[in-house]
């Protein structure tokens, strides 16, 4: 039996969104609220870059040419999703759950571009122009890669269970919405168990 604030074994939540939308902040809140471990797919990318002795820019350029890098990282995410019982943050995590028909509450977070850039500057420093240029280049690189490797358009949010806009909401408000969706998902899963 699960106590208050404890998620049942197997509850999986995927959180995706572009840089600056607040996904990491949301995941940290959900980790406490749902008592689930949290994994950031970007950390897997960083681990792989470090293991190869490359900085993120060089590793990103390499991944543009070598699809096996994304395949390995995706395999790790799919393995985690199959095990369940976690929060997985990554731009493709919801899509991977959908593609492999893995049970998960799939959440996409969006935010107006000006607000995203303001948050990125607050977090990482630099000028608005520097961050806008770097963010645009990163997003274009990822969008091209996802389209080329998987046929994925990140603008297609039709398969997500919940699409949130963080532009004018506090992280706690977003967390409330995800917790409610997770509870509804759990109730639905429990009522269909054994059918």
Show the residue positions of the predicted features.
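Extreme N-terminal, non-catalytic leader segments
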Residues: 1-10
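Hydrophobic anchor at the beta1->P-loop junction of P-loop NTPases
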Residues: 15
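Hydrophobic positions on the alpha1 helix immediately C-terminal to the Walker A/P-loop
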Residues: 26
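Post-Walker A helix-loop "phosphate-sensing" segment adjacent to the P-loop in P-loop NTPases
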Residues: 32-39
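Small-molecule kinase domains that catalyze NTP-dependent phosphoryl transfer to phosphate-bearing small molecules
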Residues: 67-68, 95, 128-177
């Amino acid at each position: 039996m699960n106590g208050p604030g404890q998620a049942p074994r197997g509850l999986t939540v995927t959180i995706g969104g572009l840089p600056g939308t607040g996904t990491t902040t949301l995941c940290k809140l959900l980790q406490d609220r749902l008592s689930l471990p949290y994994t950031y797919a970007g950390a897997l990318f960083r681990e792989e870059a470090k293991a190869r002795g490359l900085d993120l820019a060089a590793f990103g350029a390499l991944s543009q040419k070598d699809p096996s890098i994304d395949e390995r990282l995706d395999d790790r995410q799919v393995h985690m999703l199959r095990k369940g019982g976690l929060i997985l943050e990554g731009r493709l995590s919801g899509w991977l759950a959908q593609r492999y028909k893995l049970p998960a509450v799939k959440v996409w977070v969006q935010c107006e571009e000006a607000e995203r850039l303001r948050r990125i500057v607050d977090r990482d420093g630099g000028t608005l122009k520097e961050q806008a240029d770097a963010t645009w280049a990163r997003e274009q690189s990822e969008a091209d890669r996802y389209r080329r490797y998987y046929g994925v358009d990140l603008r297609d949010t039709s398969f997500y269970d919940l699409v949130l806009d963080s532009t004018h909401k506090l992280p706690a408000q977003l967390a409330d919405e995800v917790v409610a969706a997770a509870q509804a998902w759990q109730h639905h899963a429990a009522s269909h168990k054994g059918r």
